[in-house]
Amino acid sequence: MSNYSIKQSAKNNYSSSSSGGFRGGHGGNEYFCGVGGEGDFGGMGGFGACGAGYGGGAGYGGGAGGAGYGGGAGGGGAGYGGGFGGGSGAGYGGGFGGGAGGGYGGGFGGGFGGGAGGMDIFSTNEKQTMQNLNDRLASYLDKVHALETANTELERKIKEWYEKQRPGSSSGDGAKDYSKYYTMINDLKNQIIAASIENAKFLLQNDNARLAADDFKMKFENEQYMRQTVEADINGLRRVMDDLTLSKSDLESQLESLSEELAYLKKNHEDELKGMQVTQVGQVNVEMNAAPSSDLTKILNDMRSQYEDLAKRNRAAAEEQFNRMSTDLKNTLSQGIEQQKESKSELTELKRTLQSLEIELQSQLAMKKSLEMTLAEVEGSFCMKLSRLQEMIVNVEEQIARLKGESECQTAEYQQLLDIKTRLENEIETYRRLLDGDLSKPKSGGGTSTNTGSTSSKGSTRTVKRREIIEEVVDGKVVSTKVVDM
């Protein structure tokens, strides 16, 4: 059976030689290599050793200067095949085998076609197609290798960057350690917070002092108003007292006039009594025997007693009237004073209530103003925070959109690379079929067989082996492959 192992050398690449082919042979990257034994598919060479094709020379397999598809140990040819067992092939279309000329068999002791002509089954277009496929495969592998190298480099740079950004890291490129600044930053933050708290305390004390000053000012104004009110009340009481003094003076003058009148009446009465007594003493007693007359003394005494009683009654009535009027006036004055005191106390209480209500109103207004200022500050801070959050949301959305775009691009690139990989796998499968000897186009659903031969000659000894490759193709796809040695 054919032995065509696919290897990769220690260099892990497929670099082209100076002649145009892939480097192989005795130590290069051997794509189809291995030391071919008797009847094997290949020889010592790989993907090219000294020519410009896939094999040695200009062929696909090639040996140490050979030119065949599998390559043997022949001389330097130039064909695509060059001989299954070696020889000196003669051109791309010169045969799949070797020998002295072209031909399909070549190495079976003259080749399948006798070694002098053979069947030209490959054309120049097929050679160019294979060369193009070879170039595309090499380009793809180079691109994959370059991408892997770039990816490794990017991973290394990302890792180094994360190592640099990690706190306390000390990389070889002189990364700085900022951990010592964190304590300073925290101390400064604490100082800023303490200063802010102290500033807030000072502002609060200032507001309290201003409110206290306003309260004292209001109290002073209220006390001043109360003082003016009390002074006005005192002036009113003074006027009332003056009126009462005038009334008292009038009453005293009336009392004096009444007393003088009483004294005058008494004096007149006494004078009349004295005059009557003198008249009675100096009269002449004339006695007549007549009817008894009334006693004048008794009459005068009766009159005097009547006048005295009348004077007493008048004096008592005047005193009673004076006392009653004085009592009424005193009661009225006392009631007025009591009402005035009650009114003053009620007014004072109302003023105190008004003052307390005004103070409470001022405090509530100040509290309302401070709360409004606090609310405005809180609304401003929250508006700023909301704007920052909205900016962060917009940035995150932009990053998400950018990442989505990058992901879509990477997905498209991945799909493209996957398609390229699929096409390359199909091309490699085509290469394998070509290596297996499937040189003719099989019919759909049927199996075909191709006879290949290999020959190796040493002196006069010739060994010939035949094998049959059977492939089952369904809808243009190879379903199964079978190799039968003849």
UniProtKB/Swiss-Prot annotation:
<comment type="similarity">
    <text>Belongs to the intermediate filament family.</text>
</comment>
<keyword id="KW-0416">Keratin</keyword>
<dbReference type="GO" id="GO:0030855">
    <property type="term" value="P:epithelial cell differentiation"/>
</dbReference>
<dbReference type="InterPro" id="IPR002957">
    <property type="entry name" value="Keratin_I"/>
</dbReference>
<dbReference type="Pfam" id="PF00038">
    <property type="entry name" value="Filament"/>
</dbReference>
<dbReference type="InterPro" id="IPR018039">
    <property type="entry name" value="IF_conserved"/>
</dbReference>
<dbReference type="GO" id="GO:0005198">
    <property type="term" value="F:structural molecule activity"/>
</dbReference>
<feature type="region of interest" description="Head">
    <location>
        <begin position="1"/>
        <end position="125"/>
    </location>
</feature>
<feature type="compositionally biased region" description="Low complexity">
    <location>
        <begin position="449"/>
        <end position="461"/>
    </location>
</feature>
<feature type="region of interest" description="Disordered">
    <location>
        <begin position="435"/>
        <end position="466"/>
    </location>
</feature>
<dbReference type="GO" id="GO:0045109">
    <property type="term" value="P:intermediate filament organization"/>
</dbReference>
<dbReference type="GO" id="GO:0005882">
    <property type="term" value="C:intermediate filament"/>
</dbReference>
<comment type="subunit">
    <text>Heterotetramer of two type I and two type II keratins.</text>
</comment>
<feature type="region of interest" description="Coil 1B">
    <location>
        <begin position="185"/>
        <end position="276"/>
    </location>
</feature>
<keyword id="KW-0175">Coiled coil</keyword>
<feature type="region of interest" description="Linker 1">
    <location>
        <begin position="162"/>
        <end position="184"/>
    </location>
</feature>
<dbReference type="InterPro" id="IPR039008">
    <property type="entry name" value="IF_rod_dom"/>
</dbReference>
<feature type="region of interest" description="Coil 2">
    <location>
        <begin position="300"/>
        <end position="438"/>
    </location>
</feature>
<feature type="region of interest" description="Coil 1A">
    <location>
        <begin position="126"/>
        <end position="161"/>
    </location>
</feature>
<feature type="region of interest" description="Tail">
    <location>
        <begin position="439"/>
        <end position="486"/>
    </location>
</feature>
<feature type="domain" description="IF rod">
    <location>
        <begin position="126"/>
        <end position="442"/>
    </location>
</feature>
<keyword id="KW-0403">Intermediate filament</keyword>
<dbReference type="GO" id="GO:0005856">
    <property type="term" value="C:cytoskeleton"/>
</dbReference>
<feature type="site" description="Stutter">
    <location>
        <position position="380"/>
    </location>
</feature>
<feature type="region of interest" description="Linker 12">
    <location>
        <begin position="277"/>
        <end position="299"/>
    </location>
</feature>
<protein>
    <recommendedName>
        <fullName>Keratin-3, type I cytoskeletal 51 kDa</fullName>
    </recommendedName>
</protein>
